[in-house]
């Protein structure tokens, strides 16, 4: 399988062969959805908490006698129906994490990479290096490539100049190639990768590596 490689001016400079084991996988919507939900769940802290009627401050004495006042019967002022009372059935700390087998997680990444390539949402550039941080230069490159926002840029070894050149552009996110994940790729319409990043991805998620 061959794909074109662009330079910083948006011109095709060559074609490279890429692995069909990584970029030629049929799309499995159910698998990708499962992997996305698992990643989102694993990112949750699960530390939200409310106080029950047994934990809020206040007396446990019955507010007034059961009968004879004409009012509705009432117990402690810590009851959930009263102001400053405890919360009934509120959120408690819990573990939201979901386990996903390694092979399923890796196959889901291959599915998304293949879908991006097939739908024209993946572009490969020969290199992305900057002598100094220049947002203008990065913006010119993205314009020349005719990318669609939001954009995810993956490189093999991001340096400070590259990160600073891209971080001030709206709807542009950068990531090391070895940290590509389902969530970032699905949330960003366009994926831009350097040639070295493509090779790193093939090595990481090729069939021989698991």
Curated annotation (Swiss-Prot):
InterPro entries the record matches: Ribosomal_uL4 (IPR002136), Ribosomal_uL4-like (IPR013005), Ribosomal_uL4_dom_sf (IPR023574)
GO molecular function, one term: structural constituent of ribosome
UniProt entry keywords in alphabetical sequence: Ribonucleoprotein, Ribosomal protein, RNA-binding, rRNA-binding
Location of region: Disordered: 41-60, 67-98
One Pfam family here: Ribosomal_L4
GO biological process, one term: translation
Family the UniProt entry places it in: Belongs to the universal ribosomal protein uL4 family.
PANTHER family found in the cross-reference section: 50S RIBOSOMAL PROTEIN L4, LARGE RIBOSOMAL SUBUNIT PROTEIN UL4M
Subunit structure: Part of the 50S ribosomal subunit.
NCBIfam families assigned to the protein according to its UniProt record, in alphabetical order: rplD_bact (TIGR03953)
Function of the protein: One of the primary rRNA binding proteins, this protein initially binds near the 5'-end of the 23S rRNA. It is important during the early stages of 50S assembly. It makes multiple contacts with different domains of the 23S rRNA in the assembled 50S subunit and ribosome. Forms part of the polypeptide exit tunnel.
Identification of the protein by name: Large ribosomal subunit protein uL4
Annotated organism of origin: Dehalococcoides mccartyi (strain ATCC BAA-2100 / JCM 16839 / KCTC 5957 / BAV1)
């Amino acid at each position: 399988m061959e794909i074109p490689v662009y330079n910083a001016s948006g011109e095709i400079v060559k074609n490279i062969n890429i692995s069909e084991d990584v970029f030629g996988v049929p799309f499995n919507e159910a698998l990708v959805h499962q992997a996305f939900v698992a990643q989102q769940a694993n990112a949750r802290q699960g530390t939200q908490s409310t106080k029950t009627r047994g934990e809020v401050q206040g007396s446990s004495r019955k507010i007034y006698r059961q009968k004879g006042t004409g009012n509705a019967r009432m117990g402690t002022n810590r009851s959930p129906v009263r102001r400053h009372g405890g919360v009934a059935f509120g959120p408690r700390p819990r573990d939201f994490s979901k386990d996903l087998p390694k092979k399923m997680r890796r196959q889901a990444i291959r599915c998304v990479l293949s879908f991006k390539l097939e739908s024209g949402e993946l572009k490969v550039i020969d290199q992305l290096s900057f002598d100094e941080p220049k947002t203008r230069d990065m913006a010119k490159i993205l314009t020349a490539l005719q990318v669609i926002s939001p954009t995810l840029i993956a490189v093999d070894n991001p340096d400070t100049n590259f990160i600073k050149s891209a971080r001030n552009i709206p709807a542009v996110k950068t990531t090391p190639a070895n940290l590509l994940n389902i969530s970032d790729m699905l949330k960003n319409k366009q994926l831009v990768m350097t040639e070295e990043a493509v090779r790193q991805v093939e090595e990481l998620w090729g069939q021989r590596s698991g």
